[in-house]
C-alpha cells in the first residue's frame, strides 16, 4: 500500500489535529483578520469540511467526495474575495499548524508546496 501524505502525517487523528490547530490559529492571530472575516462566526462547519477534504486530498478516505461530491474548490470559494493577502494568511496558519505539530521537516516541505499551489489557485482577486 502506498505511503501517502495521509499515512505519513499520522492518519485521521493527525489530520483532525492539523485542521483544529489551523482554525485555532486563524481565529486567534491578529495578523489573519482578513482571512477570518470571510468565515462564519462558528467555525464548526468549516472545520468538518476541511477535515473531510484534506482526508482525501492527502491520500486517505475520500470523506468529502462521499458526502458532497466533487470539491470544486475554486467554484465553492468564488463568493469570497481571495487575494494574495488571504492566500498568504492561510499559508501562515497552515504552516504554523504543521510546525506546532512537530511534523517531519521533509513532510512539511512537501505539504507546504502542495498547499501553496492549491491556495494560490483559489485566488480570485
Residue ranges and their predicted role:
Residues 1-125:
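Core of compact, soluble alpha-helical bundle domains
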Amino acid at each position: 500500500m502506498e505511503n501517502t501524505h495521509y499515512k505519513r502525517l499520522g492518519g485521521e487523528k493527525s489530520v483532525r489535529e492539523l485542521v483544529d490547530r489551523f482554525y485555532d490559529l486563524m481565529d486567534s492571530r491578529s495578523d489573519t483578520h482578513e482571512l477570518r472575516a470571510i468565515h462564519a462566526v462558528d467555525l464548526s462547519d468549516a472545520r468538518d469540511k476541511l477535515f473531510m477534504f484534506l482526508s482525501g486530498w492527502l491520500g486517505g478516505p475520500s470523506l468529502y467526495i462521499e458526502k458532497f461530491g466533487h470539491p470544486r474548490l475554486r467554484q465553492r470559494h468564488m463568493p469570497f474575495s481571495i487575494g494574495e493577502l488571504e492566500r498568504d494568511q492561510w499559508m501562515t496558519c497552515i504552516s504554523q499548524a504543521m510546525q506546532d505539530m512537530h511534523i517531519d521537516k521533509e513532510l512539511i516541505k512537501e505539504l507546504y508546496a502542495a498547499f501553496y499551489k492549491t491556495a494560490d489557485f483559489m485566488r480570485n482577486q
